Amino acid sequence: MTQQQKQVTWVTLIVVVALVLDQALKLYIRTHFQLGEAHEVLPFFQLCFIENDGMAFGIEWFSKIVLTLFRIAAVGVLGWYIHLLIHRQARTGFVVTTAFVMAGALGNILDCVFYGRLFGYAGWLQGKVVDMLYFPLITNSAGECLFFRPVFNLADACITTAVIVILLFYRKDLDASLTKKTDDAKA
């Protein structure tokens, strides 16, 4: 098996496994929890059911359909970028990490495209993203979270973790791939 074939296999595996885990957890939470319901798993970790219209960690901007269409276009560009990385024989770690960004983006897109219609509260492209992971790491005496309030999902975790790993360990690879694209466009 060539290096390119191995990278394609890794990308496919990561995207499929991450999507299956993300969607399975979201569907479980959506069908077994009431909106706003929370269960403590560990003193610093809760599963709770919230939905958001926005981006990662509930950030909101633009209309729902515009945001969903933007996400779909961004995943298309990201898929093309991963294809170029593989074709240009980028390091496997960089390709794999970038695949986690794509997997996370696809996970949230599925919510937006299908969940509104599937659960009967909105049309196509207008679904809400299901979030459930909550880590109230530091709380006050009243139990109110003082540090790290976001509730997020596995897709958000894939994106955020991958971006941090890219910035910490693959910055040169990222810079080189972007410079290479610019140089190719000039030629």
Named regions from a protein language model:
Residues M1-A187:
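Alpha-helical transmembrane bundles and membrane-interface segments of multipass inner-membrane proteins
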